[in-house]
Amino acid sequence: MSAASNPIVLSSSPEHCAPRAAAPTTHDFNEAAAVPSRGSSPESILSPSSLCRLPTRSRYFQKESLSDEPRTENGPPRGPPSKTSERREKREKKVERSISEPAAGLDGVRPPLLPQKANAPKRASGSNKKRGKCSKSETSTNKTLTGRVAKSGSMGSQESDKTATDASQCGSLRQKSPKPSDDGGNNDLQLEAALKRRLDWTPTKDTSIELVDASQEGAKEGSSKGFGDLLAGYSFNNNLLFSKCTSNDTTAEESTEDSQNGDRASEAKRRTKQRTKKFTTLTARVTARYQSDDMHSRLQTENPDGFMESANGNMPKLKRKGTSRSKRQQPEVVILSPEEAVKSLNEQDLIFGTCSQLEREDSPTMIRDLQAAIHESEQNMASQPTNSLLQRAGGGSMSTSTVSRFRAPKSLWSVAARDLDGSLIDAEVVDLTESPSFKPSMANKQVTAGSIPENPPYEEKIRESDSISQPSKRIHNQDEAPKPEASEHTHLSMPNYNDFTDAVLSERVTEFGFKPLKNRRKMVELLEKCWETKYGPSLYINDTSDQQAGPASSTSRVASARLQVPEGQPSKTKESREATKPKTAAGSKRTTKSDANPCTAAGPTRERTKITASGTRLNKPSSITSYRDVEEIEDSEEEIIPSPNRLQNNFRISRSSKRTASLSVTDTSSSPSRMPLSAGLSGVDKRNPSDISDQITRAVRAQSSTRPGTRNCPTWHEKILMYDPIIIEDFTTWLNTEGLGLVREDREVNVGSVRQWCESRGICCCYRRLNRN
């Protein structure tokens, strides 16, 4: 071959890189877009927008094999491929298998090498100068190629081989130095680091909504919270949480749901109102008025559809209703005065009984009916003459049927009104002036107060009976007295009251129904007028036996005369009634005068054992003074101060024994011989006078049995029990005028002895306070 066919090509610019060198790391995107791509040009860097595109050419076109080296026509084949080229092939295969995103890598998206044109070295521009900048290692390798002689026929193949070798060398250099250059071209992309991260893991999508606001301090804390914490922060704050531009379908659905919820709430209210709780125990009945209905308030305040109502704007109304209910559940506490509290306690009705009795009937009228029945039974007990003297005074047939008259169906009320013997408990004071009586044939029948016929012949006989223990044989002995004897005693002589002591005079005054007077002369005049009104005018007799025995004997004689009157002669009964009318008319003025100040009365106002006391009260009903004497349950220990009921029973027994003794003396004394003054008195005066302090104690206890105290005017015994201060002057005056007369004591006491008696028994006493101006 000649030398002309093999020309030598010398590089005109040995210090710069060859035009077929690899592309530099920095590249201007605008200039690269204008320059057409050629096989001899370096590989261009893709723009950020092109990285997101799907690879089309590299995946569907055949790539050039770098291992197949072309052979020259005259020269031998080139050696095996370098290590950098093998590494390049492995990397390309790995990238093709693991690509999942469009920007998976740049080396796998290489376009195929195109054949270089012959006139490529002739083109030179400013952009080529920028791309010509390479590292020193590349320039040194390019310098070895300069000055090489090649044949003209193999020029194109040699140039293509150089281009492939240069590209592989640039790729290996790029792999060995992954750090970006200091010029700042690859700092924004960081392609190698992004490739490694996407091969290792796939990031999850963040569904939490972050509030992009730099002014809020809690933005970072809100992003770290979970979904439940975010929902917990939604609450109604009087602002519309949803926009008004909602669809018509959503509004219609919400309105239908609200109407359904309202219907359910109204049905629940009706159901709760219809339920009525039945009380079966005493505790439930008493505490029912203080229980609060919590179920009704819970159904109205709790609403499960709160969010839906807040969207429609209905929550403020429900909140206002809730506040009003909370106020109703807390009622105002009203503190009553002591008087109102006691009044409400007295008006409160409590029914005690077992559960079986209360469950028998649960009607609302049961309590009212029960109270009406109790009230009616109490009225019947008060109106019926329950004194057992009524049966014993009528004879043997009446005394044998003591309980038969009052026998009724057994119940708790009938059992409670009887004593240990089975008979009804006797009343304390019963005015039998106009009380009816019963025939012997009605003894075994049960009668009421309305069906009792009047039988006047037994009127005086009932008044003269003294006590239960008085034998009936005494009455039969009086019945045997002749009738002329009663006519002899029709004109009785008036006793000489001037010879009586003050105690006896005060006792006789109380027998006629008046209180004792302080003036002795006025008491004598009062007794004389009462005697004349009752028995008519008579002469004075100085016989003391007649003075003492006169009233008692006349009482017995009149009683015997009354008992002998048959039922078919009502004429004497009318006369006896007419005889008692003037006495009442004469004593009416004194009665009104004595009753003007009931609290200052020193003595009892009635005596059921005296005929004169009962004669002055003809028109008083018996139901006013009929009280049940219920015996208290005694304790095992002996009481230091006996109860009023014990004192009353003891005093009643002593009075009956005294009256029995006095009647026996007057009946047996038929001679007009002179007798001592104490013969007609009770047996207490015959004994030796006891200590005056014991007499004071007996007088105080006797007052409570004869005259029960009231709240405004209590007795002396009640005052002592309540530790009220006792005024010594008033107490001494009462003892001298009335108190000692109740126990048949003629002596008088002074202020010093009364004070000594009070101090010895621990009674609070004091003198009257003098008002000094």
From Swiss-Prot:
Pfam families from the xrefs?
A: Slx4
Q: What does this protein do?
A: Regulatory subunit of the slx1-slx4 structure-specific endonuclease that resolves DNA secondary structures generated during DNA repair and recombination. Has endonuclease activity towards branched DNA substrates, introducing single-strand cuts in duplex DNA close to junctions with ss-DNA.
What post-translational modification information does the record give?
Answer: Phosphorylated in response to DNA damage.
UniProt GO MF annotations: 5'-flap endonuclease activity
A single BP term in Gene Ontology: DNA recombination
Subunit notes for this chain?
A: Forms a heterodimer with slx1.
- Alphabetical list of InterPro entries matching this protein: Slx4_ascomycetes (IPR027784), Structure-sp_endonuc_su_Slx4 (IPR018574)
Start-end of Low complexity biased regions: 36-50, 660-673
Sequence segments annotated as region (Disordered): 1-191, 248-331, 436-495, 542-623, 653-691
Which protein is depicted?
Structure-specific endonuclease subunit slx4
Major location (coarse): nucleus
Spell out the family assignment given in the record's similarity comment: Belongs to the SLX4 family.
| Residue spans of biased composition, Basic and acidic residues class | 61-72, 84-99, 476-491, 572-581
Name the GO cellular-component terms.
Slx1-Slx4 complex
Compartment(s) of residence: Nucleus
Assigned keywords, A-Z: DNA damage, DNA recombination, DNA repair, Nucleus, Phosphoprotein
Origin species, per record, is: Aspergillus terreus (strain NIH 2624 / FGSC A1156)
Q: Where is the composition biased (Basic residues)?
A: 317-328
Ranges of Polar residues compositional bias? 1-14, 165-175, 436-449, 542-558, 611-623
